[in-house]
Swiss-Prot record:
Gene (UniProt): lig
Functional description taken from the UniProt entry: DNA ligase that seals nicks in double-stranded DNA during DNA replication, DNA recombination and DNA repair.
Residues annotated as the enzyme's active site: 249
Reaction(s) the record says it catalyses: ATP + (deoxyribonucleotide)n-3'-hydroxyl + 5'-phospho-(deoxyribonucleotide)m = (deoxyribonucleotide)n+m + AMP + diphosphate
UniProt key word Metal-binding: yes
Protein name: DNA ligase
Any GO molecular function: DNA ligase (ATP) activity
InterPro entries for the chain: ATP-dep_DNA_ligase, DNA_ligae_ATP-dep_bac/arc, DNA_ligase_ATP-dep, DNA_ligase_ATP-dep_C, DNA_ligase_ATP-dep_cent, DNA_ligase_ATP-dep_CS, DNA_ligase_ATP-dep_N, DNA_ligase_N_sf
Length: 559
């Protein structure tokens, strides 16, 4: 299958904002895809090369990419760099360079999707001494044979700056439409495996029956079940039917642990493989987990010198560290508090009631200094739960989780079977969709950021406010550097940005607002942290903001 067909799909997707049209375009394309291509083409459509849980990274920045194009076209790197000032997009500038190419090999072959994919895999798997030169040559070989439109989208794929507006929900709907299968079965299969390539292939070859049989697989992370927030303990108990399991809510990073014999793999909430960054937890898991094969979930917490928990950002620092890991183990010791088990020795437990899963967890875990089981309380009594809540806060934790005793595990769902109880309103994780250049000495920096929440109905990120406080000068330098390559268009001092970067914000309150299409505005938002553990698909939705607005009003006693 020719790569130009995929490039033309990207171009069509870019030209429309209509979700239904995009879905139909992707579905029609998927119908034509050979069976042996379905394992990787869904990721290319998303603008990726690998699933998010795959450790492989391309490791190619703008400079290396420009050098590869220069090698392929004979056009000086500086000329390509200068062109970006006019086009505002490196992909467009690379397309222009290929159009002006000074030579094309006599043996040039039209690019196939398979060749492009296999080359990108080779680029990702090339490491060590001399790897940058090898990566450059692999890419140059693609650009030598590429048409301008192909070069544009190869470049965007390499840099992770595709602008087609295709996200997980749209791809799910397109798979359902292409292969005439139930969308809820596609959703379920994806939530269980986090692998669109696998799901698309099953949908095409085995239809609804095959999708219905999809189950958990060790080595493919499950989308985590999520919780809403309750106003207080009393509300949580009422929602749970009068009795609930209360667990300490740790201020850490949620992880999913897959054990397969001596092999242990640990995934972050965003399903990224963080195993190498936390070797002491890997060893502790091998000792603590009795079954040969198991999938468990827990909260990874950083512990301070006083034995109290440190903010979750410390855990993220551990995740990011690729070198001198032993030094970081000393500086930021970690502790894993397990709270659920989803799979044991060939048996999926997601359709098992929560209390049975909790008992199973206690049976299969032998706690040690690094691996513990989350402290809990099962009660019908509000006062007893209040005392537990008070103790959790005194210990430096975030609050409590309340869980329905008969709840099955619902991957990817944020329902009311799990509820958080915290002393303050929940912070929001929102996507930066635009920004404004600063004033005076900050004129060269982006100084305030337009925040967007995801609307699953349209696939858009809708504005809910603008944040300019809480940032240090260093933060603004870093955000400007990070966001500049993602700028889509400029309107005076305002720029619009590809929705890729998620930040956590606090706010005084949520207000209803006719000013924004979202219907809501944040009052006095303030930057808290960059959420590197979350992608745009993990950001808070308009529906979630509506739920928090109702919760806020209940807390005020207005509802």
């Amino acid at each position: 299958m020719r790569y130009i067909e995929l490039a033309q799909l990207y171009q069509k997707l870019e030209k429309t904002t209509m979700k239904l049209i995009k879905t139909r375009l992707v579905a029609d394309f998927l119908k034509k895809v050979p069976e042996d291509h379905l394992e990787f083409i869904p990721y290319l459509i998303l603008g990726d090369v690998f699933p998010e849980w795959d450790e492989r990274e391309l490791g190619v920045g703008e400079k290396l990419l420009i050098k590869a194009v220069s090698m392929a076209t004979g056009i000086d790197s500086k000329e390509i760099e200068n062109s970006v000032k006019d086009t505002g997009d490196l992909g467009e500038s690379i397309a222009l360079a290929v159009k002006k190419r000074k030579q094309k090999s006599f043996f040039s072959q039209p690019l196939t999707i398979k060749r492009v994919y296999q080359t990108l895999v080779k680029v990702a798997e090339t490491t060590g001494e001399g790897s940058q030169d090898k990566k450059m040559k692999y890419l140059a070989n693609l650009f030598m044979d590429a048409e301008p439109i192909e070069a544009k989208y190869i470049a965007r794929t390499v840099l992770g700056t595709m602008r087609t507006g295709v996200a997980e929900g749209l791809l799910r709907d397109a798979i359902s439409l292409a292969f005439n299968v139930k969308v809820e079965l596609v959703e379920r299969a994806y939530m269980l495996t986090s692998d669109f390539g696998f799901v698309a292939k099953i949908a095409k070859t085995e239809g609804n029956d095959g999708l219905a049989k999809v189950t958990i697989q060790i080595g493919k992370p499950i989308k985590p079940m999520l919780a809403q927030q309750a106003a207080n303990i009393k509300e949580a108990l009422l929602e749970m039917g009068g009795e609930a399991e209360f667990e300490i809510k740790y201020d850490g990073a949620r992880v999913q642990v897959h054990k397969d014999g001596e092999k242990v793999t640990i995934y972050s909430r965003r399903l990224e493989n963080v195993t190498r960054a936390i070797p002491e937890i890997v060893e502790a898991i091998k000792e603590a987990l009795k079954p040969t094969k198991a999938i468990v979930e827990g909260e990874l917490v950083a512990i301070g010198e006083d034995g109290r928990p440190l903010p979750f950002q410390y855990v993220l620092r551990r995740f990011r560290r690729k070198y001198n890991i032993e030094e970081m183990m000393e500086k930021i010791p970690l502790e894993l508090n397990l709270f659920d088990v989803l799979y044991v020795d060939g048996v999926s437990l997601i359709d098992t009631k929560f209390m049975e899963r909790r008992k199973k967890l206690e049976e299969i875990v032998e706690t040690n200094g690094k691996v513990k089981i989350a402290e809990n309380l099962i009660t019908k009594n509000v006062e007893e739960a209040e005392q537990f809540y008070k103790r959790a806060l005194e210990m430096g934790h975030e609050g409590l989780m309340a869980k329905r005793l008969d709840a099955v595990y619902e991957p990817g769902n944020r329902g009311k079977k799990w509820l958080k109880i915290k002393p303050t309103m929940e912070n929001l994780d929102l996507v930066i969709i635009g920004a404004e250049w600063g004033e005076g000495r900050r004129a060269h920096l982006l100084g305030s950021f337009i925040l967007g929440a995801y609307d699953p109905e349209t696939g858009e990120f809708l504005e809910v406010g603008k944040v300019g406080s809480g940032f240090t000068d260093d933060d603004l330098v870093e955000f400007t550097k990070m966001l500049k390559p993602l700028i889509i268009k400029e309107e005076g001092k305002r720029v619009w940005i590809q929705p890729k970067v998620v930040i956590e914000v606090t706010y005084q309150e949520i207000q209803k607002s006719p000013k924004y299409r979202s219907g809501f505005a944040l009052r006095f938002p303030r930057y808290v942290a960059l959420r590197e553990d979350k992608g745009p698909e993990d950001a808070d939705t308009i529906e979630r903001i509506a739920q928090l607005y109702e919760l806020q009003e209940r807390m005020k006693g207005k509802v």
